[in-house]
Amino acid sequence: MRETLYDFCIRTGQQTLLQEWDAKQNAPLTPKDLSYGSKKKVWWRCAHGHVWQAMVTIRTANHSGCPYCSHQRPWPGENDLTSQFPKIATQWDMEKNASLTPEMVTRYSNRCVWWRCEKGHSWKTPVRTRTHAACGCPYCAGRKVLKGFNDLFTCMPEIAAQWHPTLNGTLTPYDVTHGSKKKVWWICEQGHVWCASIASRTGGKRCGCPVCAGKVKAQKQAYHAKMIAEHKKNDR
């Protein structure tokens, strides 16, 4: 047999491995019975009382430690989502996540799970995005559009009425949030056409038709009219 785990730890000064050897669960096996490169899975117990299984070679070659102390695995009441971020854990979608619970993931897990906010919006995102980046519901925050809740037509129908029917292609007022920075085409009651971001129309300034407001020169408006005429011609 190659050098035993016991001799290896003494020679390399890694007595911590001997201290973490779970004598009770591994009995009658001892560190003197296995080589330091053994692929046998044995039990370990860290100084904080966490218990786990790992191959001997994983511990000696990779210098891996307790998966709970390093937050690679959840330990209920210590590093799980519920105990560390109880408020966020209340938005855990129990139905869509099936048997997975907030106690089964670490607080900064990269695992993608389902959430449901107080208003009933459902979305999927990694646990870490919620706890580390402090991101909440994307619909309530206006980062994603939800028809009937934060889309332009629902929130500001009077502005949506000026949405150009052809120049925006298949995009409709239902497909964008009322605070979107996306630039789209508009047409006023007088038939003037212009391009502006949705946010500039719905924000504090509530910018309307620049032609009616006298902000656009006749030359520029004529150019827009020519371009639109060519667009209609190409669509035929």
List the predicted regions and their residue ranges.
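Functional cation/ligand-contacting sites centered on basic and imidazole/sulfhydryl donors
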Residues: 1-236
